[in-house]
């Protein structure tokens, strides 16, 4: 524990400096979903440049390198948080029926266990991960099972799934726990504080990435009617819906989108709870 604390103290000043440097760059939003690569100039529904566009400059590329440097240096800490929160994180697989060409559309994302009520597991994810008719999840121990879409809000990019206890043996249920959550503001978090973004692409908790908090509340470039957390990290496709944790494993938001250069946005925990209450009414 002493060694872990020292790592964070050593990194704290560097994280704050990186945050201040990157925040001075006029970053534009990228689409929350995967799109074409480098040659693409298409925009999202909100006019935001997509992943892989050429909207780059020397300052922005330098900032990206700084994010990568911090991420590499503190990866052991992210790995610890990944293990600490493993029982909360799931993979989300959403796919269509077979179309007239014999094709199935599929998207992969991440999710977080919000509530277990004795008969159902409630999982929070991103609404844009739930566009198709069928959904399955991979639970922390690797068990794959069907899930039902309970609720989907494109206004806040939040969605909720349910998994019936009756599908699962007791030993699988015993390895799943709801994540403890709180608003970052209620925890007294500030610019420069460390975060860990967990992706469950392919398998639960498959990647844990160090992040640094930039702002507690900004207008979401992908949706100007929404306020989100802004942070810097190396998240990638498949991270959407995944949890953003504090270094102590407290869930403060869920990943919604990010640009090519390390700026990321997360739906705040309080918004997720508010939407969950709506779907239960």
Annotate each language-model stretch with its function.
Residues 65-82, 89-122, 145-146, 241, ...:
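A conserved glycine-rich beta-strand in the N-terminal activation segment of trypsin-fold
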Residues 92, 134-141, 193-200:
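Short conserved beta-strand and strand-loop elements enriched in small hydrophobics
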Residues 13-23:
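Bacterial N-terminal signal peptides
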Residues 104, 171-226, 236-239, 256-265:
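Flexible, gly/ser-rich surface segments that form the specificity/activation loops bordering the active-site cleft
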Residues 21-39:
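Sec-dependent signal peptide cleavage junction
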Residues 88, 108, 114-158, 165-166:
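Catalytic-histidine neighborhood of serine endopeptidases
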Residues 42-74, 147, 165, 196, ...:
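C-terminal cap/linker of serine protease catalytic domains
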Residues 112, 234-255:
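Catalytic nucleophile loop of clan PA
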């Amino acid at each position: 524990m002493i060694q872990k604390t020292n790592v964070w103290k050593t990194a704290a000043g560097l994280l704050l400096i990186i945050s201040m440097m990157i925040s001075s760059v006029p970053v534009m939003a990228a689409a929350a979903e995967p799109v074409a690569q480098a040659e693409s100039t298409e925009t999202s529904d909100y006019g935001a440049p997509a992943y892989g566009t050429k909207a780059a400059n020397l300052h922005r590329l330098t900032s990206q390198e700084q994010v990568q440097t911090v991420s590499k240096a503190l990866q052991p800490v992210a790995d610890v948080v990944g293990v600490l929160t493993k029982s909360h994180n799931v993979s989300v697989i959403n796919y269509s029926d077979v179309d007239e060409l014999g094709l199935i559309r599929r998207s992969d994302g991440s999710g977080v266990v919000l509530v277990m009520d004795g008969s159902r597991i409630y999982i929070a994810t991103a609404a844009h991960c739930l566009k198709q008719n069928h959904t399955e999840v991979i639970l922390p121990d690797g068990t794959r099972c069907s899930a039902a879409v309970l609720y989907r809000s494109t206004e806040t990019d939040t969605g909720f799934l349910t998994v019936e206890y009756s599908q699962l043996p007791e030993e699988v249920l015993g390895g799943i726990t709801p994540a403890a959550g709180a608003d970052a503001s209620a925890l007294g978090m500030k610019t420069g504080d460390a975060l860990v973004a967990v992706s469950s692409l392919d398998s639960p908790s498959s990647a844990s990435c160090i992040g640094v908090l930039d702002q507690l509340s900004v207008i979401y470039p992908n949706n100007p009617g929404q306020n989100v957390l802004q942070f810097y990290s190396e998240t990638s496709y498949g991270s959407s819906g995944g949890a953003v944790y504090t270094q102590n494993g407290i869930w403060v938001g869920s990943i919604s989108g990010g640009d090519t250069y390390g700026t990321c946005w997360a739906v705040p925990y309080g918004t997720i709870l508010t939407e969950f209450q709506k779907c239960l009414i």
